[in-house]
């Protein structure tokens, strides 16, 4: 193509001013207002709790419109922290939100949930920025809903346990009530006494001795008025065994508190320095089976000198903790032994004829 017929056009336009276009590269739309309110990111947009509250107030039933607009189930595309402003402004907003989270904790989640209404708990996917600047989905709200359901189930289980009372009751009261109810079941419906000699009728009702006497007089069951003959009355062995086991358990429970009470009383007496007189007399009879001037035979033990073993002696002194000082009769040698090393000497008629003054010469 030749350039013979071309001529340059006159340039009459105003000169252009060239500026740096880097700040304009990310500036799309108007700048978001700087605020400390808790915000939620849905897609590429950021919504504030105040705007959500205003929308909820304008629409009294935001189940469909508000949920479709605000709680859109569209997943995150791109960077959820990009609010349409510059990078520097985003950093400032993040720092301000972090400081606000440090002061208020998790109040933003609660406030947003409360402003959005009670129905927002079961809403769709919602992206919420927390303290660590991370996105949370609707599982957070479903967890809250699940916790409420679990609490309701727990309360229903606690209430519906067959006895119409909560499981968190005092153990002593529950055990006493169970014992009383079991006693009522095992008691004669006519006399109220335990059916240790239970007899069963053909109709299936069981009575004790007193109830059976009334049944024989009436010739009919006291409960269902069905005719009964004396030959058809048979012993209820199973119920008799149950009554015997109940009586044993009741006796053991009645004995245990008294034993614990007695042991606690003894501990208190020992703590205050008061000894038990019955125990002291019993220990005294065990530790001091001999008296002064009693004739004993030295049995000895592994620490007793062999020359004393088997010799006859007489008790001269009674010491503490069951110890005695005895003196042999043949050579008047004294030794201190415990009561376990001594035995009562057999009765000897010749020893009775010996005058007491002969023994007192060397004592």
Curated annotation (Swiss-Prot):
Pathway info: Protein modification; protein ubiquitination
Entry keyword set: Transferase, Ubl conjugation pathway
Entry protein name: U-box domain-containing protein 62
Task performed by this protein: Functions as an E3 ubiquitin ligase.
Domain U-box as annotated: residue spans: 181-253
Extent of Acidic residues compositional bias: 87-107
Assigned EC number: 2.3.2.27
Disulphide bond pairs: none
Disordered: annotated segments: 74-117, 343-363
PROSITE patterns recorded: U_BOX (PS51698)
Single GO MF descriptor: ubiquitin-protein transferase activity
Reaction catalysis annotation: S-ubiquitinyl-[E2 ubiquitin-conjugating enzyme]-L-cysteine + [acceptor protein]-L-lysine = [E2 ubiquitin-conjugating enzyme]-L-cysteine + N(6)-ubiquitinyl-[acceptor protein]-L-lysine
Enzyme class name: transferase
């Amino acid at each position: 193509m030749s350039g013979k017929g071309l001529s340059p056009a006159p340039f009459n336009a105003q000169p252009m001013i060239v500026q740096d276009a880097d700040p304009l590269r990310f500036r799309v739309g108007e700048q978001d207002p700087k605020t400390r309110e808790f915000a939620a990111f849905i897609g590429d947009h950021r919504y504030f709790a105040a705007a959500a509250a205003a929308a909820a107030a304008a629409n009294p039933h935001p189940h469909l419109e508000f949920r479709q607009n605000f709680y859109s189930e569209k997943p995150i595309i791109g960077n959820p922290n990009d609010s349409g402003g510059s990078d520097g402004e985003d950093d400032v907003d993040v720092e301000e939100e972090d400081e606000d989270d440090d002061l208020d904790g998790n109040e933003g989640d609660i406030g947003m949930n409360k402003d959005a209404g009670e129905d927002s708990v079961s809403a769709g996917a919602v992206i919420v920025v927390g303290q660590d600047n991370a996105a949370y989905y609707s599982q957070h709200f479903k967890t809250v809903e699940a916790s409420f359901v679990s609490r309701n189930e727990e309360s229903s289980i606690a209430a519906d346990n067959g006895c119409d009372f909560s499981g968190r009751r005092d153990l002593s009261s529950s055990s006493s009530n169970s014992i009383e109810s079991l006693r009522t079941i095992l008691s004669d419906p006519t006399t109220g006494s335990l059916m240790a000699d239970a007899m069963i009728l053909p109709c299936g009702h069981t009575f004790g001795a007193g109830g059976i006497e009334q049944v024989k007089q009436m010739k009919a069951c006291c409960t269902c008025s069905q005719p009964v003959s004396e030959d058809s009355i048979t012993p209820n062995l199973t119920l008799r065994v149950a009554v015997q086991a109940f009586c044993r358990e009741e006796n053991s429970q009645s004995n245990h508190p008294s034993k614990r009470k007695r042991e606690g009383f003894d501990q208190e007496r020992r703590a205050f320095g008061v000894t038990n007189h019955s125990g002291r007399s019993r220990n005294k009879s065990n530790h001091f089976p001999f008296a002064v001037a009693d004739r004993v035979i030295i049995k000895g033990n592994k620490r007793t000198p062999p020359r004393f073993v088997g010799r006859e002696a007489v008790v001269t002194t009674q010491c503490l903790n069951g110890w005695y000082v005895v003196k042999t009769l043949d050579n008047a040698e004294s030794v201190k032994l415990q009561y376990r090393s001594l035995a009562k000497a057999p009765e000897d008629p010749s020893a009775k004829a010996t005058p007491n003054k002969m023994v007192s010469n060397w004592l």
